Amino acid sequence: QYNELLASIANTIQDYRGGSLPQPIPDHVERWVQQFDAAVQLPILQEIDHVLKKIYFSKEDVAKFLRGAMRTQKLTGDRPDKFWRSASFLDIQGGGSSQTDMLALFSEQLEDEHGFGIDDCGQGDEVFIYLDDGIFTGNRVRRDLEGWIGGNAPAQAKVHVICIAEHSGGRYYANTKIQEVIRASGKKIDITWWHAIELEDRKTYSATSDVLRPTAIPNDPAVQAHVAAMRYPPTL
């Protein structure tokens, strides 16, 4: 079963970062899992295999999601070609390259669907698209949009935040902070959030959460030292 799991995980992630993982990938996965004690390696592989099969998005999965968003009438209205022509794509991410990668992939799908890419868009001045792969803590999208709202954003705008995976708590946090900045700016800016999957991580819903939270701090010196050094104590 051990080798089967290595092969299964490798097959799922074979296109990760454009296929840049060291080959053969099963050996790479094995080197990764060997950092853990031998007794827990099999359970870890079982869980990783299970989770990745449910939430790993291959490049084709991402392209399919973007094509779906492109065709969503609730987003575009009756004339999707006109909507996308008028929309402006924000390239304002303060760190990393995920937004640039998503914009390039979206442009490819737009070209296939309507015959033009994002460089031919932006003919209007009211609709703006913020693309990214995921919203986790919400800090990235929050800071990006806060800076834009306080700077280049027009007095009135509609912003669509489109991402693959969205953590409920991260979106709630980001949206709350962004709304504060909008009010302070005096601008009229509406934010709408779109996602392929939503992961529940709000503490209020810990019993049905999609993330695992500790219920107790083990009596282990290394763990206790780590917890003591945390800026905010964990919620148990």
Model-derived features: where do they sit?
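A glycine-rich, hydrophobic loop/mini-helix early in the fold
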Residues: 88-104, 108
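Short acidic low-complexity segments
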Residues: 114-125
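Short, well-ordered alpha-helix to beta-strand connector turns
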Residues: 125-126, 156
